[in-house]
């Protein structure tokens, strides 16, 4: 039987049923993520196209195009000070002209919400990951964080 890739509803909405998109949660770790390490994620609870892999904690672009990504979670660290997470594209930090780092300041107790989004132009086979920045911090997981992305066009 044929695969339906695009459906237009009676009121004009375009439904792209096979359009690449994913959402996953931060894998809970009761210890700190070391500086400059990749943030681990759980199996995706949305993974249309199967383009997110929890085996290597990355999204791989199935086609050339513009992709939007969003990341958020609660973060704590020992003592007060700044911390950041950052987007990686093909193994290198995607900052500067692309936007990049997600910063916050920790008071020394409790949790802070860290979030950010980015739009990247990707070629087929390019991959995107989220990394912890230059400080050892604890990324909360399970019910508290999410990494998601989708093909915009």
Locate predicted features.
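Short, small/polar residue-rich loop motifs at catalytic or cofactor-binding pockets
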Residues: 1-2
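Extracellular jelly-roll beta-sandwich "head" domains, especially the C-terminal globular C1q domain
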Residues: 5, 9-153
